[in-house]
Amino acid sequence: MYQAKRERMIGKKILGERYVTVSEAAEIMYNRAQIGELSYEQGCALDYLQKFAKLDKEEAKKLVEELISLGIDEKTAVKIADILPEDLDDLRAIYYKRELPENAEEILEIVRKYI
């Protein structure tokens, strides 16, 4: 979950928080790198995000919106967009503590458009 102004220091507060895809997190970190030098940990995070982002930010955002329109909660939709499950077994891994939704095949059809 991305939190704007996450630091809890004097004069800083959390402005809001929302779930973001790996692609969007990579863009956030890249933009932060343009402002100033990243710490070692931030640099490693940026490298990881760039390696594992499977879609660009706009594609991922569109996929999440399509999944939410099917009634999937935002957190799960973001996870599906990050993993891009190819079959029911992959989708079951995301829903490991819950039952697969009845529209699981429809979810996979939508995801396949982005693979």
Curated annotation (Swiss-Prot):
It catalyses: RNA(n) + a ribonucleoside 5'-triphosphate = RNA(n+1) + diphosphate. Its EC number is 2.7.7.6. One of its GO terms (biological process) is DNA-templated transcription initiation. The keyword Transmembrane does not apply. It holds the Pfam family RNA_pol_Rpb4. Keywords: Cytoplasm, DNA-directed RNA polymerase, Nucleotidyltransferase, Transcription, Transferase. InterPro entries: HRDC-like_sf (IPR010997), HRDC_dom_sf (IPR044876), Rpb4/RPC9 (IPR005574), Rpo4 (IPR010924). It is found in: Cytoplasm. GO terms for cellular component: cytoplasm; DNA-directed RNA polymerase complex. Belongs to the eukaryotic RPB4 RNA polymerase subunit family. DNA-dependent RNA polymerase (RNAP) catalyzes the transcription of DNA into RNA using the four ribonucleoside triphosphates as substrates. This subunit is less well bound than the others. Part of the RNA polymerase complex. Forms a stalk with Rpo7 that extends from the main structure. This is DNA-directed RNA polymerase subunit Rpo4.
